[in-house]
């Protein structure tokens, strides 16, 4: 599983904070550096630098910073691993759950998603629960998540669904 091990947890927390702030500024807003926001950033830094499961689910109500934090994580990884800071080249592929559902009808594209080393799926729960593909009913997001989990691939997911809704749907 991917772990950031060249920098300390405190360094990563600082990088994430800067990336989060940049994401907010790009939307022409001001960052609210309250305790909940800073706690989420700190927990993300802990996850990125520790020996935890390879998946991160960020869920909750609309507008609480899920996608902003996920983008900050992606941006931080991109800066640290796709620049002069590293000989390794790593980046996180970002896709919406709706795009995953559309992609399912193209086996080659869907296989590429399954095999991405690092993937961020935004807004699960907005896609159709199941679709018809070649006459078969499939649940693309569920299939993708199970496939990635089985192979312990780095996956970040955001959703506006609550615990119960996530459990019922996935």
Predicted regions and their residues:
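Walker B catalytic acidic pair
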Residues: 122-124
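A short, basic N-terminal segment
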Residues: 1-52
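Short loop/turn elements that form and flank the Walker-type P-loop nucleotide-binding site
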Residues: 51-52, 88, 113-115, 148-152
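Hydrophobic positions on the alpha1 helix immediately C-terminal to the Walker A/P-loop
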Residues: 69, 73
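Hydrophobic anchor at the beta1->P-loop junction of P-loop NTPases
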Residues: 56-58
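Conserved glycine(s) of the Walker
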Residues: 63-66
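AAA+/P-loop NTPase substrate/partner-engagement loops
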Residues: 75-119
């Amino acid at each position: 599983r991917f772990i950031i091990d060249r920098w300390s947890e405190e360094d990563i927390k600082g990088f994430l904070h800067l990336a989060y702030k940049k994401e907010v500024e790009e939307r022409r807003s001001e960052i609210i550096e309250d305790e909940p926001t800073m706690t989420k950033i700190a927990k993300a830094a802990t996850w990125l630098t520790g020996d935890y499961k390879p998946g991160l689910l960020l869920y909750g109500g609309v507008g609480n910073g899920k996608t902003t934090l996920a983008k900050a994580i992606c941006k931080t990884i991109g800066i640290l691993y796709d620049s002069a800071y590293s000989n390794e080249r790593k980046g996180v592929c970002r896709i919406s759950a709706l795009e995953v559902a559309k992609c399912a009808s193209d086996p080659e594209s869907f296989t590429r998603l399954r095999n991405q080393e690092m993937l961020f799926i935004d807004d699960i729960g907005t896609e159709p629960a199941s679709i018809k593909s070649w006459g078969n009913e499939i649940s693309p997001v569920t299939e993708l998540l199970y496939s990635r989990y089985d192979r312990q691939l780095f996956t970040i997911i955001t959703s506006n669904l609550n615990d119960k809704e996530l459990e019922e749907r996935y």
